[in-house]
Design a protein with these regions (language model features):
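Structured beta-strand-rich core segments of catalytic domains in phosphoester-bond hydrolases
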Residues: 37, 42-109
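N-terminal, active-site-proximal structural segment of metallo-dependent hydrolase catalytic domains
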Residues: 1-47, 51, 57-62, 177
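Active-site-proximal beta-strand elements of phosphoester/diester hydrolases
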Residues: 1-9, 98-110, 142
């Protein structure tokens, strides 16, 4: 099973930069989007052969997620069932016979860390949600987790130590998640790889200099490790400040 995740930073803008071509060429079984920045009816994208699921933020032009699946799921859930977290279109979960599959756009802690306290609450509630799913079936989830976990996951760790996405608090929550029975699939295959990132600022020619961060992930329940085949980061694909990531798994 081939899974793709891409934080598109506005799907309408990305459509003008080759999105549909990449979608068709990828031919993924599951294709996930984060940061769609859409409201219902604002785009006409219904690829043949896929079931489409969209979650929109109440605030226009903000956040949003989508999943395109070749197989129709047993059930779809939008959000995690907590009103304070479910207004921004950040989470979609599909239930299949043998596993759960979710895409998520984790809240950014913002400059000056103005949303860090909220982010910490989100992290605790999201982990509890994942653990509840995991008690029933193994879980795969993907998306922009808005954290570089280790120093090798960004180009400039020292100068970013207290910036959103690389605070001790955010990294600690990621450590806790991975210590709760979940696997960072890219690091499973490439534990020491450096210089491979999924996001680059639009400023300072960051992508040209590869001054990036790895903040997009495919995470699975640990018990799916024997079924993992590869994890990829498509740094050659443009169209957003993020590039697509991929998981190949025998399911």
């Amino acid at each position: 099973m081939k899974c793709i995740s891409w934080t598109v930073n506005g799907l309408r803008a990305c459509m003008g930069k080759g999105f549909a071509d990449f979608f068709a060429a990828a031919n993924a079984d599951l294709f996930c989007l984060q940061e769609t920045k859409l409201q219902a009816g604002q785009i006409d994208f219904a690829p043949p052969g896929y079931h489409a699921y969209w979650n929109y933020a109440e605030k226009k032009g903000y956040s949003g997620t989508a999943i395109f699946s070749k197989q129709e799921p047993l059930r779809v859930q939008y959000g995690m069932g907590k009103e304070e977290h479910d207004r921004e279109g950040r989470l979609i979960t599909l239930e299949f016979p043998a596993f759960y599959f979710a895409t998520v756009y984790v809240p950014n802690s913002q400059r000056e860390l103005t949303r860090l306290d909220y982010r910490m609450q989100w992290e605790d509630d999201f982990l509890a949600y994942l653990q509840t799913l995991d008690q029933n079936k193994p879980v795969i989830f993907c998306g922009d987790l808005n954290v570089a976990h280790r120093e090798i996951d960004l180009k400039n760790p020292k100068t970013n130590h207290k910036n959103a996405g690389f605070t001790d608090e955010e990294r600690g929550k990621m450590t806790a998640l991975l210590g709760s029975g979940f696997t960072d699939t890219f690091r499973y295959f490439y534990p020491d790889a450096t210089g491979i990132y999924s996001w680059w600022s639009y400023m300072f020619h960051a992508r040209e200099k590869n001054a990036g961060w790895r903040i997009d992930y495919f995470i699975t329940s640990d018990r799916l490790q024997p079924k993992l085949r590869d994890a990829k980061i498509h740094t050659d694909i443009f169209g957003s400040d993020h590039c697509p990531i991929e998981l190949d798994i025998d399911l």
